[in-house]
């Protein structure tokens, strides 16, 4: 035979762009500040809109027949995005008897819209990213069901091309052609950037004792839990919700087909369940007691006797309470990195 010989060389990669410039932002806002009840109450509201242009983006509307694709083209100042929304803040301070009370809250709603990104005209409107929020995930829509053995043999049940197993996720056939493929991907869930952010604080003090609480929350937001939902044996481990997996093993008397909430755990099986889908993107809205502190400030006169400028003892904590729809993981955690699959 012949001994192969390799030779290092160079080739042109992505084209450069010497004309890159700054983004352009045009902002407009209207605000109102109100004070009443001798300034005990303060209310602030602000309406805003921002239009950004010249955003760096790579064209995706160049035909493949040209010999170029998005991986070879340089980024250009072509993107356009609109952000608009409102925010308001309310605060209250008062002394009730010997108790000093301070309450406050804020709420922000901001929605973005992709106006232009040089996107090719795709076959179906639900595939387009234009007119969706920034950070909007795309993928398959999970029907809430899993493929059963009968489904695999039924030609009327839409299925993807390639390997598929009983217990895999069943996705919607959006275009009705009987095949689950890239034409069935659409915007799923909310954006990964929360549209709503809010918080409120409570502060009470009485004769040196004090209690400070700060709550924080977010809504209209989705998070992708790749490692935990896509790679079930991530870090060679499983989680409690994996107990609700799809199982059909009549010899051992196991049948969870009617109650399963998670696909079958199979190493080296179908990769179809790993595809981006609404199964992986969860509603990660939450309300959390972000910080809490209870303490006592010693009297100034006592501190002076001890030659101290001040003395305080306190207990504090963070993330003490969380209210969310997920339950088994921190809703602010977003595992976008590639997971690990265990060994058989």
Residues of each region from the PLM?
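Glycine-rich, aromatic-lined ligand/substrate-binding cores of catalytic
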Residues: 191-226
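Active-site-adjacent bridging/hinge elements
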Residues: 2-9, 59-60, 174-180, 258-271, ...
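Extracytoplasmic gating/loop element in the C-terminal half of outer-membrane beta-barrel translocons
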Residues: 166, 218-312, 317
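Short, surface-exposed charged micro-motifs
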Residues: 33, 160-161, 201
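Extracellular/periplasmic, surface-exposed regions of secreted and cell-surface proteins
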Residues: 1-137, 276, 281-344
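Conserved small-residue
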Residues: 76, 95-192, 230-232, 244-255, ...
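A short beta-strand motif that forms part of the nucleic acid-binding face
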Residues: 49, 60, 215-219, 228-229
